[in-house]
Amino acid sequence: MKEKNILFFFSFLINYLDNLSKNFCFRDYISFELNLLAETGYKLDLTKCCVSHVTTDLTYVSPKSARALSYKVGKPYRDKLLILPKFLLAKDSEITLEEKKQALTLTNYFFNRYLFHNNRQVKAREEFIEYITNI
């Protein structure tokens, strides 16, 4: 039942965004995905480094703890970490295509791990990701 709801959700979202493509706000959508993860019990903590507790130069997210890491702390492990897109920290910055992809990789990792339970990604979500990275 849960998988059918997820399939419906992303199918609906594709159709909805098709009508709103001129007004689509990527920042708001990623915020929605992060809030959806939080509401289902998987909140990402992007406010400070989980090791040094600094709030500056946050660059990575640990896939194990879902918490941010500073560049200095994360650099030796960067191949095992997710990238924290800068626009999630700097609210007024322009969002590049690369940052869009980083943000979707970040949320997609946690969707696949916790909501889709490492099953094959929902096809509708794949189509949705392709769509919004081209807006």
UniProtKB/Swiss-Prot annotation:
Single Gene Ontology BP annotation: DNA recombination
Q: Which domain of life is it from?
A: Bacteria
- InterPro entries (UniProt xref): ARFGAP/RecO, RecO, RecO_C
Which Cys-Cys disulphide bridges does the record give? Answer: none
Q: Entry's Pfam families?
A: RecO_C
Q: Specify the protein name.
A: Uncharacterized protein RP549
Q: Which organism is it from?
A: Rickettsia prowazekii (strain Madrid E)
